[in-house]
From Swiss-Prot:
InterPro entries: MFS, MFS_dom, MFS_trans_sf, MFS_TsgA, MFS_TsgA-like. It is found in: Cell inner membrane. Residues 1-10, 72-77, 122-133, 183-205, 266-272, 318-331, 382-393 are cytoplasmic. PANTHER family: L-FUCOSE-PROTON SYMPORTER (PTHR43702), PROTEIN TSGA (PTHR43702:SF3). Signal peptide: none annotated. It is a multi-pass membrane protein. This is Protein TsgA. It comes from Shigella flexneri. One of its GO terms (cellular component) is plasma membrane. Keywords: Cell inner membrane, Cell membrane, Membrane, Transmembrane, Transmembrane helix. The keyword Cell inner membrane applies. GO terms for molecular function: transmembrane transporter activity.
Length: 393
């Protein structure tokens, strides 16, 4: 593989995470405006975003097998066509059914693209370099989470319709589409090089179960938290801009944390530092949820920084539970995380409807505590140390 080709594939991976981050995180900013657009209460409107999350979940789950049937480049180019159709559907229709369909299509495109992006990184990089590359790739998720709420706040404050936010997000996929030209992708399945030796099948082990539960609870907790921070902040008397700033600050700190931890993680055992970070994140979220508005800005910055490496480290540890990284194993952990994404508004929408936004934030806090327990238990069964020892000889 040429260096320029590797760079293009790496940038496709970066942008695939930015696309998913933008679609998922901007929801909290535009939800109120979309609810007004369709004359629905916010708690009811939040349920329609389950179609976005369901699309992500289904596509990531199926793509573990589709990647071996449909070439990666073909998937990405077809995804561009679907993205154009979905954004056009949002812009030119006032039907709630079509809105839900467009959201589902956006989810499918996002899930396919992100699973391809994750696979490319695990395929091109090995060992500790894989972990730091995955962490840097995931930083584009939070970079989009920092940039697009600011774009949304800018557009909405000027009474520009909410669907233009999704048109802006579509530009990320335009860049991915352009990068596919003149770029060679790894061949899988029947198109894979015949010289490759057959890979011996390995049992995944109970560590994968702990990591999968941790991935689900972490994503459900994180998105359940950040999706309702704007409503919670507005309930405390903050303006829409100030609420948007809280979300942007979280993702800015998250992004900086990823860059920092992509260097720091090289010096620590991944399972041990993951347990410490999960415990710290649970404590900091509790401080935010029970603190005063004066301290919210600082606690959300600290939470963003110290929780930034958790999800990517879970994926990296998952890929290290077998001697040879398995696309199906990585996709399984990703799928569990995406189940958390899909359940976000199913779980939190009901909680907010009955008990208000703070109850959703406290539920997210409980889920972070579960992540800590799973990471602690992983220490007794993880295989990453023996596999790292084998690869270092």
């Amino acid at each position: 593989m040429t260096n320029s080709n590797r760079i293009k594939l790496t940038w496709i991976s970066f942008l695939s995470y930015a696309l998913t981050g933008a679609l998922v995180i901007v929801t909290g900013m535009v939800m109120g405006n979309i609810a007004d657009y369709f004359n629905l209460p916010v708690s009811s409107m939040s349920n329609t975003f389950t179609f976005l999350n369901a699309g992500i979940l289904i596509s990531i789950f199926l793509n573990a097998w589709l990647m071996e049937i449909v070439p990666l480049k073909t998937q990405l180019r077809f995804g561009f066509l679907l993205m154009v159709l979905a954004v056009a559907g949002l812009m030119f229709s006032h039907s709630l059914a079509l809105f839900s369909t467009a959201m589902f299509i956006l989810g499918v495109v996002s899930g396919i693209t992100m699973s391809i992006g994750t696979f490319l990184i695990t395929q091109m990089y090995e060992g500790r370099q894989r972990g730091s590359r995955l962490l840097f790739t995931d930083s584009f998720f939070s970079m989009a989470g920092m940039i697009f709420p600011m774009i949304a706040a800018f557009l909405l404050a000027r009474s520009i319709e909410w669907y233009w936010v999704y048109a802006c997000i579509g530009l990320v996929y335009v860049a991915i589409f352009i990068l596919t030209f003149g770029c060679e992708f790894p061949a899988l399945g029947k198109r894979a090089p015949k010289t490759d030796a057959p890979v011996e099948k390995e049992k995944w082990g109970i560590g994968v179960l702990f990591l999968s539960v941790a991935a689900l609870c972490y994503i459900l907790g994180q998105l359940g938290f950040i999706s309702w921070v704007p409503e919670y902040a507005k309930g405390l008397g903050m303006s829409l801009n100030d609420a948007g700033t809280l979300v942007s600050n979280f993702w800015m700190s998250y992004m900086v944390g990823m860059w920092a931890f992509s260097f720091i993680l090289r010096f620590f055992d991944l399972q041990r530092i993951l347990t410490v970070l999960a415990g710290l994140a649970a404590i900091l979220m509790y401080v935010f949820n029970t603190g005063t508005p004066v301290h919210m800005a600082w606690s959300i910055l600290a939470l963003g920084f110290f929780s930034s490496a958790i999800y990517t480290t879970i994926i990296t540890l998952g890929s290290q539970q077998t001697k040879v990284p398995s696309p199906k194993l990585v996709n399984f952990v990703l799928t569990c995380g995406t189940i958390g994404t899909m359940l976000t508004f199913v779980v939190t929408g009901t909680i907010v409807e009955h008990s208000g936004p703070q109850a959703a934030l406290l539920t997210a806090n409980g889920l972070y505590a579960v992540v800590f327990v799973m990471c602690f238990l992983l220490g007794f069964v993880s295989r990453h140390r023996q596999h790292n020892t084998l690869t270092s000889h």
